[in-house]
Amino acid sequence: MGKGTDKLYITHSEWSSSDAYGASTGANAGARAQRRGASFKKLPFNFCAASLQPFKNPVCTPDGTIFDVEVIGSWLEKHKTNPVTGEPLSAKDLIKLNFARNGDTTDSDENKGDLIDPVTFKVFTDNTHIVAIRHGSYANVFAWETVERMNIKPKMWRDLVDDEEFGRRDIITLQDPQNVSASRDLSQFKYLQDGQDAILTKEQEEERKGGTVNIEALGRVGEKVLRAKEAVERARAARQAGGADVNRLTQALTTTSTNSATNNNKTAIARGQSLIQERKRPANAATYTTGLTAASFTSTGLTPSTSGSLALLSDEQYLLKPSHRIKNKGYVRMETNLGPLTLELLPEFAPKAVWNFLRLSEKGYYRDVAFHRSIRNFMIQGGDPSGTGRGGSSIWGKNFEDEFEGPNTHSARGIVSMANKGKNTNSSQFFITYRPASHLDRKHTIFAKVIEGQDTTLTAMENVATDGSDRPLNKIVIKDMIILIDPFAEWMKEKKQKEGEEERKREVARQGGTEDDRTTWTGKRIRADGTMEGQGMGEGGGGGPKVGKYLDVGAVKKAATTTTTTTRKAEEEEVDTWEEPVRKKAKMGGFGNFDGW
């Protein structure tokens, strides 16, 4: 409440009120409340969560986030994550949505008509509770009240459209007006929080490329519009390529003047770019800080810190990040008492399993460990030091999660996978298949395959007789694991070489640019003081006569003189010398070949 009377003091009721004059609220309470309300914005149900435009061919994730199939497809080709939540996402996780429309869909316009419930024919709005009933890779869309009244309450668990059976867990909520989840709240979208723009649809990309401005009708202004559009496209391309400062980059590339002031300007630009690159975020930086700033402000025993620098991940944490794709193949030779097996490691889609196997092999964990289980025409299992099948521990001392993402399947002989006793219970045990076993797909993590020794060693293992509990009667023992190529070490080596090459290029730019930056269009090089080579120098200097910009006549003559000095001295004593007659210079018209400029 405001002031009721014209008093020279604030009453008790005014102090305790919750409006703009309350002591606990402040004079700008209304503005703050308005900002809080403006921060929330709901995505319409018929809009793609990635492009923020109406969808044409809708698909959804298992949690109910709707995308257009073309837009999310282009996103997954680059990022492999859900743009809304940031969690890993692949194309096979998407579910096609079948919406019903009340218009004639046989026309060329596929989106003609409103989206409706296929049973009650009610039009969907932003206030309709919408669900989808999943059947494998597709789902039919209904209103919740229809499913509740005709399926759940009568316990008739068959789809009302195609009569397919479903369960309660197959019901996916697409929109609930009473519970607006993060999948519909624009302020919670991760790619928008990260500062990225909405993904363009194909129509928007074509419109942006072609343009919609009538340049001819604008006259001179049209040329300015074209130049502005080209500048925006260059800036966008440079930002996508590496985030460089477009103005500085353009200035550094187009500066070709030979005076000293221009060279000083280029040097300052190179220094500015080097400062920006020095502040570049490290590759192994975490998403959280070291915490020294908060700790130094709360503890007198620490030195005050105000930088808020990011924490650095260890090599193991950095290499095993889900966003990494280490495509280098690794190789390990398994020495057994029946012969060697050469394994090819696959760290691209199972980095943790490969890391665990390599580190255990490196410290000799598998040395003298026997294979405790062998089933003919199926597989052989080992990796348990106790030999019981119930032991074993990972390199981290605890079980680690499964890694099923990727195209690897148990479709051949010699596939090496992690043995487990349930979901996310991988330790040190592994098995090698004797035959294809497709029923093990997405149940056991595949991390390697046998590339040498299948016909000899693996066949000998399979032929060993077993007892009633599938334990080999004659022991099959791993003598040693020899690491031939460590894919993580190779990847780090390539990364360091790449960083060294980038540092060398930055050093060249810091010293004045590349060779092309210090050469004029006539082919003459510019010195550090701003003068050109060959300028102000006679025959005795370093800039003798040249043929074009490639052949230095003076250098050729000097080399020929040096190599034949002894011969000439001997010949001069015996052969008379004669003077070559002076040739008349032919008159030339015009500018000639510009070699005197």
Swiss-Prot record:
InterPro entries (alphabetical): Cyclophilin-like_dom_sf, Cyclophilin-type_PPIase_CS, Cyclophilin-type_PPIase_dom, Cyclophilin_A-like, PPIL2_U-box_dom, Ubox_domain, Znf_RING/FYVE/PHD
Annotated Pfam families: Pro_isomerase, U-box
Gene Ontology terms, MF aspect: peptidyl-prolyl cis-trans isomerase activity; ubiquitin protein ligase activity
Pathway the protein acts in: Protein modification; protein ubiquitination
Residue ranges occupied by any PPIase cyclophilin-type domain in the UniProt entry: 328-483
Entry keyword annotation includes Cell membrane: no
Function of the molecule: May catalyze the cis-trans isomerization of proline imidic peptide bonds in oligopeptides thereby assisting the folding of proteins. May also function as a chaperone, playing a role in intracellular transport of proteins. May also have a protein ubiquitin ligase activity acting as an E3 ubiquitin protein ligase or as a ubiquitin-ubiquitin ligase promoting elongation of ubiquitin chains on proteins.
Protein name (database record): Peptidyl-prolyl cis-trans isomerase-like 2
Upper lineage: Eukaryota, Fungi, Dikarya, Ascomycota, Pezizomycotina
Gene that encodes it: ppi-2
